Amino acid sequence: MSAMSAMGKPEHGSATTSDLEHRATESSLEKQDVEAAPPGPVKPVDPSPKQSTLKTTLLLASVFLAMFLVAVDRTIISTAIPSITNDYNSLNDVGWYGSIYLLTCCAFQLLFGKLYAMYSARVVLLVSLVIFLAASALCGAAPNSEAFIVGRAISGVGSAGIFAGNIVAIVHTIPLAKRPKIQGLMGAVMGLATIIGPLIGGAFTTRVTWRWCFYINLPFGGLALVAIFFYFKVPNRSPAADLSLKQKILSLDIPGTILLVPAIVCLLLALQWGGQVYDWNNKYIIVLLTLMAVLFVAFIAVQICLPKTATVPPRLLMHRSVVAGFLTTIAIGSAQYIFVYYIPIWFQTVRGVNAVDSGIQLLPLMISFVVASIVGGLLNQRIGYYTALGIFGSSVMAVGAGLMTTWNLEISQGKVIGYQILFGFGMGLAFQTPNLAVQTVLPRPEVPMGIALMFFGQLLSAAIFVAVGQNILANQLLSRLAGIDGFEHLKSLILSGGVTAVIDAVPEESKHRVLVAYSDALQQVFIVGLAMSCVGVVGTSCMEWKNILKKPAPPAGPPAGAPTESAPVETKAAGHT
């Protein structure tokens, strides 16, 4: 690695901000991983601070609890929205309640990766939790729709930090060989949260008030906050400890962030509005997409021209497994959201069940995902080669997706359940593969940025492909129902997002045609999920075959006689920051 040789050279004159930041990042964190030793074979030091099993268990419990709260927060609102709109008389704001959270979470994900790489992971995670809890309190107490939307936006920012921070906490605490089981459990926690989120929201809304969907985060989030404060051990000196305040600010890639955040905002707004609020050829959509493209190109240029302070350093993309992992994350995330979002719509339209029952019909997919996440973690910890399980899991996932594209009006319930189980089980086996690849192939200082890149891909793909699916569904319905009596009225219902309203609006003799149109249109949506599942197979197949059970080779020392920087190396568990 070029950075290692650069560390052996003495510095002359005043260093630039980027040089200081680069040296601080690499030298400070690399000293955490390997003990100073004479030339020759060196045994790497376990990068995880030593602490009691009880303290580690409490920390992991708090990390899982924080992740559970964030995952539930994404879905708990779905069953509460009718009551929220009734209280605020804000039917026109419904779209913002969910999208603003996803927008800010996605937009700030990469920035938090940079923060975790440069500053104390413990402090950044605690601040993220505080932001999330404060936003939850604001949402619960919001006097009007505008305040509620602001609270959801801030909640998304805190969630972005918690998503990446929980994995970073595991990296700092658990040895690499033992992480697959822990991350498998984390995947199971996220899957469980997705299942019960709407149920919890419905229970609070019906029995108490929808505001408790957000107040409930405060006591449990407070417990996680206290446990992380006391039990999350990180090195005393952060990579940015030697930088001045000005240098710390400059190291955060302010130009890149200023370009990236509005680019994502433009993209998600265009996807939210395109084909529904405005036609795709409307001037507002064209301006948003054009501005998005310009900002993204400018962001890439900044990352290339200023690599030492880049939010996504180009050196990350020099690792084959990182690029393959990013592709896999996008593929799995988009396929997951396509099916999780549109399977309930299939049940509500083709099978005629209500919203609650359609969620129950999704349980085979989600339960198999939870089980496979746990099984995958155990197998990865036993086998060591995560790529093998990733290829197998993504292949099973693709087969399940392909079978679900055959759903029609006559398909049996047994096949509906079986195909979901196949898809969910394959997805669960492959779900953690990108994160394990990043942790294995990247130097430890760059792991937070790599993890943030994976979460960014997952969130961005979810936002994009749910919107893509909605546009495919609407366009397919319009083309298949053209010529039916009352088409203009049906067209307005389709474009306004009405699902069962379209079926209820047609006379009895036309219902079968509408059901067939829905079934065929949703097949086309599922084909998109199949295509992305196949991309996941390509992504996992391109990953390097690394064994997490083998200890990494120590970094090469400087050539004999070369000047070196001397610095004390900590060999004890570091204290709090």
Curated annotation (Swiss-Prot):
Supply the alphabetized keyword list: Membrane, Transmembrane, Transmembrane helix, Transport
Which ranges does the record mark as transmembrane?
A: 52-72, 93-113, 123-143, 157-177, 184-204, 212-232, 249-269, 285-305, 326-346, 359-379, 383-403, 416-436, 449-469, 525-545
Query: Mind telling me which CDD domains this protein's record contains?
Result: MFS_Azr1_MDR_like
Which Gene Ontology molecular function entries are recorded, alphabetically? Answer: transmembrane transporter activity
Which Pfam families does the record associate with it?
MFS_1 (PF07690)
Locations listed in the record: Membrane
Per its UniProt record, what SUPFAM superfamilies does this chain match? Answer: MFS general substrate transporter
- Broad class of where this protein is predominantly found: membrane
Question: Between which residues do disulfide bridges form?
Answer: none
Which segments show compositional bias classed as Basic and acidic residues?
A: 19-34
What is one GO cellular-component annotation here? Answer: plasma membrane
Q: The organism sits in which domain of life?
A: Eukaryota
What membrane topology is given? Answer: Multi-pass membrane protein
Does Heme appear among the keywords? no
Any keyword Translocase?
A: no
Show the segment(s) annotated as Disordered: 1-49, 554-577
What does this gene product do? MFS-type transporter; part of the ergochrome gene cluster responsible for the typical purple-black color of the ergot sclerotia. The ergochrome gene cluster produces several ergot pigments including the yellow ergochrome secalonic acid and its derivatives, as well as the red anthraquinones endocrocin and clavorubin.
| PANTHER family registered for this protein in UniProt | AFLATOXIN EFFLUX PUMP, PUTATIVE-RELATED, MAJOR FACILITATOR SUPERFAMILY
Its family remark reads: Belongs to the major facilitator superfamily. TCR/Tet family.
Q: What is this protein called?
A: MFS-type transporter CPUR_05422
